[in-house]
Amino acid sequence: MAKEKGLTPQSQDFSEWYLEVIQKAELADYGPVRGTIVVRPYGYAIWENIQQVLDRMFKETGHQNAYFPLFIPMSFLRKEAEHVEGFSPELAVVTHAGGEELEEPLAVRPTSETVIGYMWSKWIRSWRDLPQLLNQWGNVVRWEMRTRPFLRTSEFLWQEGHTAHATREEAEEEVRRMLSIYARLAREYAAIPVIEGLKTEKEKFAGAVYTTTIEALMKDGKALQAGTSHYLGENFARAFDIKFQDRDLQVKYVHTTSWGLSWRFIGAIIMTHGDDRGLVLPPRLAPIQVVIVPIYKDESRERVLEAAQGLRQALLAQGLRVHLDDRDQHTPGYKFHEWELKGVPFRVELGPKDLEGGQAVLASRLGGKETLPLAALPEALPGKLDAFHEELYRRALAFREDHTRKVDTYEAFKEAVQEGFALAFHCGDKACERLIQEETTATTRCVPFEAEPEEGFCVRCGRPSAYGKRVVFAKAY
C-alpha cells in the first residue's frame, strides 16, 4: 500500500522512507553544495513553530536575544584546547577575502562560545553585570562527512544559549532549567517522550565540564540526541579572561553555560511519529492543524465553497491553523492522499449531501472518521487536537517501553541495541566505551537522572559500575 502511494515502507528500508518523505511532503530538498539542504516553506513553518515556543519560554526565564558574528578568528578557537580539538575536523575556514589572503584565517561559526566569551571579557566587570542570559538564533557550519537532511547537514539552523554566572551553583541551576525547557518542548509540543540525563566523559561537548541531554528513540530503534545543555565551568572564562569583582571585592572568574537545539528536532518529529503513508505531525507544531477539502460537482460548487469558507473563518476564530484546499485541478482523493502525506492531524470533508444534513465528515490522521454537526466543529476541534497529541505521545511512549531492555550480559546487550535502548552497567572507562562502540556500533546515550540507584558490574569488562545506576546505550543518529 505504501509503495502505491510512492513511499518505501518503513519495515523495508527506514532510511529510504525518511529521505523520501522529506522530499515528497515538501519539507526540504538537496542544495547544490554537498551536505546542504533547502528547507521549503512547509518544513520552515515547522521550524518557525518550534522557534515561537522556545523563544517564548526563553524570554519567560529572563533570556534576551542577541546576534554575534559568523566569522571567528582561528586564534579564538585555539584558546580552549579541548574545544578546538573537538571541532577541528568539522571546521570551514576562510583564508581569502576581497581577492587577498587574510592575515589570520577565520572559522565559519561552528558554535559561539569563543566569540561570546571574548565580548563578555569586555562587558563584565562587577557582580552587578551578572548574570548574563543570552540566546542567539542563527546558522552554524560543521563540515560533516556523512550527511542526512535535518539530522546532519554542513550548515544548519539552531538556537544557542549562552549564560555567565557568579557562582557554580547558579550556573548548574541554569543548565538544568534549560534542559527542562527542551524536555517540555519535546513532551508537550512534539509529543516525543525523552530521557533526561548526563553524557559520559567520552560523549560530552568539547570544552565542557559536563553535558546534559534529552534522548529520544526513533521508530527504527535508533536514539536521537534532541537537545543539550552544558556546564562549562571556568574553562572559557579562563581562556578569555572573563573576571568580575564580587560583593566582597574579590576578583573571580565567571561560570558559564551553553545550550542548543537545532532543526534536527524536525528529524526527531518525522522519525518518532511518521508511518507508511507519510508524516504524522504533532498538532501543536503542525503548520496546518485542520485542512478542509470541499467535494462538489459544478452545480454545487458555489454552495459548498461558501460553506467551506464559513467553516474556515469559524476555525480561524478559534485560533486554529487552517487551510482550505479549493484547487480545482485535483480530485478529492488526490487531496486526501496529499494531506495524509503531509501529516495534517485532521481533515474535514464537506460535500453537498453533508450540507443538506448540516454536517461534515472529520477524518483523523491517526485513523478513523466521524460525522459531526457542522456548527459543532469549531467548538469540538481544539479538544480533539489535544486528544490527538495525547494519543501520539501514548503511542511513542509505548514504542519506547517495548524497545527498552535491562541487560546484564554482553550477548543480551548486543541483541538489545539492535532494536532500541539497552540499560546496562558501565565502568566509566573511555577505552571500554570505545570498544563497545567498535564491536556493536552502540554508544552511551546518557546516565538518566530519573533512574533508580543500582549497583552492578560493567556489561563488557566486569569492573564495578562507575555511575551507581544503569546507563542508556543505543545505536544513534
Swiss-Prot record:
Phenotype for residue 477 to A: Slightly reduces the aminoacylation activity
InterPro entries reported in the protein's UniProt record: aa-tRNA-synt_IIb, aa-tRNA-synth_II, aa-tRNA-synth_II/BPL/LPL, Anticodon-bd, Anticodon-bd_dom_sf, Pro-tRNA-ligase_IIa, Pro-tRNA-ligase_IIa_arc-type, Pro-tRNA_ligase_II_C
Positions contributing to ATP binding: 142, 153, 225, 228, 262, 264
Keywords, in A-Z order: Aminoacyl-tRNA synthetase, ATP-binding, Cytoplasm, Ligase, Metal-binding, Nucleotide-binding, Protein biosynthesis, Zinc
Region spans: Interaction with tRNA: 340-369
A Gene Ontology molecular function term of the record: proline-tRNA ligase activity
Top-level taxon of the source organism: Bacteria
Residues annotated as binding L-proline: 111, 113, 142, 230
Similarity field: Belongs to the class-II aminoacyl-tRNA synthetase family. ProS type 3 subfamily.
Name of the molecule in the record: Proline--tRNA ligase
UniProt organism field: Thermus thermophilus (strain ATCC 27634 / DSM 579 / HB8)
Protein's gene: proS
